[in-house]
Amino acid sequence: MSTIIDIHAREILDSRGNPTVEVDVILEDGTMGRAAVPSGASTGAYEAVERRDGDKTRYMGKGVLEACAAVNGEIADALVGLDATEQVDIDASMIELDGTANKSRLGANAILGVSLAAAKAAADYCTQPLYRYVGGTSARVLPVPMMNIINGGEHADNPIDIQEFMIMPVAADNIRDAVRMGSEVFHTLKKELSAAGLSTGIGDEGGFAPNINSTRDALDFILKSIEKAGYKPGEEIYLALDCAATEYFKNGKYELSGEGKSLTSEENVAYLAALVADYPIISIEDAMSEDDWDGWKALTDALGHKVQLVGDDLFVTNPERLATGIERGSANSMLVKVNQIGTLTETLKAVDMAHRAGFTNVMSHRSGETEDATIADLAVATNCGQIKTGSLARSDRLAKYNQLIRIEEALGETAEYAGRSILR
C-alpha cells in the first residue's frame, strides 16, 4: 500500500517571484506527499546544480519546465512501483539515473523535490509527522532560531557588505517565547531605523535593508534595539553573522566596498576577531571564501574555541567537502541546506558526519523560499539545535517558525528548547 503509483511535478513561484519545482508523490492507498524546492541567491560553486530552462522568453530564462519534465518522465518511470518508505533506495535510484557528480543532468531541483515529497508521503502513510518519521523517537529538540533582522550583500540593495545580521534568543524557555522575543526586537529595530531616517524596507529574507555602510553601525542598531525591547545582549540574546565572504572575495582580497576596505586573509581574520571582541557574536557563517582553505584554518585557530564558525559555501552540505574541512581543521559547524546536495539521504549523511566530528549543524532555508516548511521538521528530526529561516516578516519565513510552534505543542512535555546549550 506504500507503493508509489504516480509522481507529478509542476512549475510554481518562490518568494522572489522566480519559478521553482513542486512535486507530488502519490501512493497506492491515496496518500500524497508534496514538496517545493527552494533556491539560493549567493550560491556555492560546489553545490548540486539547479536545472533552469535558459529560455529568455519565459521568466528571463529561469523557467523550470525541463526539470519538471525530468520528474514527470525519467524519474517517474524509474520510481513508480517502489516503496515510498525505502528512502535510501529512492534517492540512490535517482542519483544513479542522473549519472553526474553534481546532479546536473536531471537537476538537483528535480531530484530534491521527489526526495522530499516521497519522505512526506511515507510519513503520512505511517501516520507520523515528518520530524518523527525521519528522526525517530529521539526527535524532540526545538532549535534556537538565527533571526535575520538586517539584510545586506546579495540579499538587499544597499551598501552593507555582510549579508546577514542575526539575533539568537538563547534565554527563551521554548520556541514560542523565542519567536516572541525575536518579534519584539524586530519591531523595536524598525522604530529605531525609522527614527534615524533610514529605510525600513525589507530584503529577500524579511530583514530590514537600511542604507548603512558600516558593519559596526548595523550591529549598534541591533544592540540598541535588543536593550530597548527589554533584553540583555550577550546574556539573553546573542548576535550571529553570515558574511557570505565568497561574494566579495576578488583577486585574493576581501573587498569590503561599503567600508572601503581591501583585506588579505590575515587582515580579514583580524577584522572579524575585533568584531567578536567588541560585540556578543557567537556564530559567524562563511567568514572566509569557499576556496580560501588556509584562511579558514587561520580563522578557526584564532576564533574556533569561542565562536561557532559555520561553513555554508565551504561545505555545501556535501560529505566530501565536509571531510576535507574536518581533516584540515577548518570551521567547526556546517550549514545544512537540502538543495545544496539534492537528496534527503545525502543530507542526513552529512549531518551525521558533522556530528561525529564534533561539529554543530544549523538547518537552513534559502533566500528564495516557498510556504513549504519541511526544514522545520528536519531541524527537529536531526536534533541539530539551530535553524536559520529568516526574519519575523514574510509568510515564506514565518511558515517555518509557525511549524516549529506546532511541533513543540505536539511534543508536549517531551519537547526541549536547545537554548543556552548551543553556547561554546
Swiss-Prot record:
Annotated pathway: Carbohydrate degradation; glycolysis; pyruvate from D-glyceraldehyde 3-phosphate: step 4/5
Keywords (A to Z) from UniProt: Cytoplasm, Glycolysis, Lyase, Magnesium, Metal-binding, Secreted
Annotated (2R)-2-phosphoglycerate binding sites: Q163, K337, R366, S367, K388
Keyword Signal: no
Binding site for Mg(2+): D242, E285, D312
Pfam families: Enolase_C, Enolase_N
Biological processes annotated in GO: glycolytic process
Organism domain of life: Bacteria
Principal subcellular localisation of the protein: cytoplasm
Localization in the cell: Cytoplasm; Secreted; Cell surface
Family stated for the protein in its record: Belongs to the enolase family.
Record PANTHER family: ENOLASE
Name of protein: Enolase
GN (gene name): eno
